A protein has these predicted regions:
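Conserved, structured core segments of small domains
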Residues: 10-140
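Bacterial Sec-dependent N-terminal signal peptides
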Residues: 1-12
Length: 140
């Protein structure tokens, strides 16, 4: 079975309707804000049971933000430590993202804190929220 380089290098036809729907610029990109979730300063103040309840609220908040179309990507880092995970928000400014992060029970409790960075990435990320439910067999 052989493949030619040309078959992989072909460019798909530009879809102006899809680009507009996803908020893409002429490069197929858009502005987001990435949030690095870091271990908060107050983790040790809570019992195991309290942290479990805070985590439950954190997960519910993730679902709410995703349902509102504001949170595009969320997930933990595998090895834990100081860096706990990431969010990618469909907002253009850190101020908008900060307002969203302040709705999180884990942030409010000081179990997590956020480092916010404006990011320029593919507008195709906006399609993840349509694809992910087709791949997810279990809820968290």
């Amino acid at each position: 079975m052989g493949f030619s380089v040309g078959s992989f290098a072909q460019k798909a036809a530009y879809d102006s309707v899809l680009a507009a729907q996803l908020g893409a610029d002429e490069y197929g990109m858009k502005r987001y804000v990435m949030a690095f979730l870091l271990a908060g300063d107050r983790v040790q103040e809570y019992s195991t049971e309290e942290r479990a309840e805070i985590q439950k609220g954190h997960m519910a908040n993730i679902t709410n933000l995703a349902d509102e179309g504001k949170l595009i990507v969320a997930g933990p880092f595998i090895n834990g430590g100081e860096k706990r995970g990431i969010f990618i928000f469909d907002v253009a400014t850190k101020e908008e993202a900060e307002a969203l992060t302040n709705t999180d029970p884990a942030i409010k409790a000081g179990v997590l804190k956020m480092e916010l960075v404006e990011w320029y990435g593919s507008a195709a990320l906006m399609m993840l929220t349509d694809i992910y439910p087709k791949l997810q067999k279990k809820d968290f």
